[in-house]
């Protein structure tokens, strides 16, 4: 199968044509007529996580663990909200979303090929037939990642990824295409951007970078605007030129 757009083949693009048509109409409305349009969605599907990462905002807003929706409740929400607006895609977050495979399955059934799941990768990754991809969080190389997410967490995530990509293809595409890595850059790990990108090159599909957003005044993980941050941006731009289909 030929990949034309981020892992999508010709049959995928034909099937999803109505969504792309709506997407470009919304872009025109936004750019030309300054209308408010929804292009992409996100859903917190679980209020539980097995890690306590030092940079994560979720712990500040944590609610009752028992106050969660059933899979069929989520199906109703998907049909009445996400699908009605013809969103181009949806990202599932938490907590740790892979602890609710029943909900992930509902989203994949209702929005085939348009669902990505953000995960810490410490649990085995299920092969959902209609999943778009997994966003696996790695916050730098092993030592700094473990200082943020807990001792041994990097190796657990690495083992999970390697186990998944050693598995069978899905819809004619090799398993490694399902794995994208995301790194949240902060004051502890910014020096490891290049090393992490090089380490995972030719193992997974893509890697993306974002800067840590401070959620309290004086957040020590915040990388302030200035020379150092600019150097990190320049580094990412250089990596993009070096690995245009990977970064």
Predicted regions and their residues:
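Radical SAM enzyme [4Fe-4S]-AdoMet core and its adjacent flexible, acidic
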Residues: 1-4, 12, 64, 132-139, ...
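Conserved alpha-helical substructure of the radical SAM core
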Residues: 2-127
């Amino acid at each position: 199968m030929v990949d034309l757009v981020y892992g999508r083949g010709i049959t995928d693009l034909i099937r999803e044509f109505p969504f792309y048509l709506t997407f470009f109409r919304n872009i025109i409305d936004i750019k030309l007529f300054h209308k408010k349009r929804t292009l992409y969605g996100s859903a917190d599907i679980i209020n539980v996580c097995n890690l306590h990462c030092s940079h994560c905002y979720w712990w500040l807003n944590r609610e009752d663990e028992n106050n969660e929706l059933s899979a069929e409740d989520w199906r109703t929400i998907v049909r009445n909200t996400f699908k009605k607006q013809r969103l181009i895609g949806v990202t599932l977050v938490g907590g740790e979303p892979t602890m609710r495979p029943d909900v992930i399955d509902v989203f994949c059934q209702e929005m085939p090929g348009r669902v990505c799941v953000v995960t810490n990768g410490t649990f085995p990754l299920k092969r959902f037939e209609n999943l778009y991809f997994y966003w696996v969080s790695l916050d730098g190389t092993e030592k700094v990642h473990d200082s943020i997410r807990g001792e041994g967490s990097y190796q657990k995530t690495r083992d999970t990824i390697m186990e998944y990509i050693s598995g069978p293809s899905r819809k004619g595409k090799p398993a490694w295409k399902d794995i994208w890595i995301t790194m949240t850059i902060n004051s502890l790990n910014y020096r490891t951007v290049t090393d992490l990108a090089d380490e995972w090159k030719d193992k997974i599909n893509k890697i993306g970078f974002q800067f840590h957003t401070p959620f309290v005044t004086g957040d020590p993980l915040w990388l302030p605007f200035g020379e150092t941050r600019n150097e990190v941006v320049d580094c990412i731009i250089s990596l993009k030129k070096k690995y245009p289909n990977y970064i």
